[in-house]
Amino acid sequence: MRYNEKELQALSRQPAEMAAELGMRGPKKGSVLKRRLVKLVVNFLFYFRTDEAEPVGALLLERCRVVREEPGTFSISFIEDPERKYHFECSSEEQCQEWMEALRRASYEFMRRSLIFYRNEIRKVTGKDPLEQFGISEEARFQLSGLQA
């Protein structure tokens, strides 16, 4: 997937759902744990050197797995390349849990599944499709048949 660098930098400056200084180790062999400012914006996880305003990198949180490793640590890996893991170290177990939950909820697919679930729940209660008023109820992306388990 291609990204426009200026657009990514602009996105990295947007208000974050979560931000903290965490220990981070990249996927390369021999990579060491470094302190990084980590910032979750929509479905991107930006990471910065602690003394710089521009991100060092970004992870698109789609088709990824967030897994607890040791106490106070978690990793992010991607379905296409499960051996390529990014490791994060939190200051507490509570912080680790908060980050893992936020990262799991950040993907487009999670939001789509939630929308479909709540759409169906509202339809059961009211008998009406809540998306109909927006003129998007027939779009394929909002259909249960397009949902993969």
Curated annotation (Swiss-Prot):
Tissue specificity comment: Expressed in testis and liver.
Domain PH: 15-108
GO cellular component: cytosol; early endosome; recycling endosome; trans-Golgi network
An individual GO BP term: endosome organization
SUPFAM superfamilies: PH domain-like (SSF50729)
CDD domains for this protein: PH_PLEKHJ1 (cd13258)
Name of the protein in question: Pleckstrin homology domain-containing family J member 1
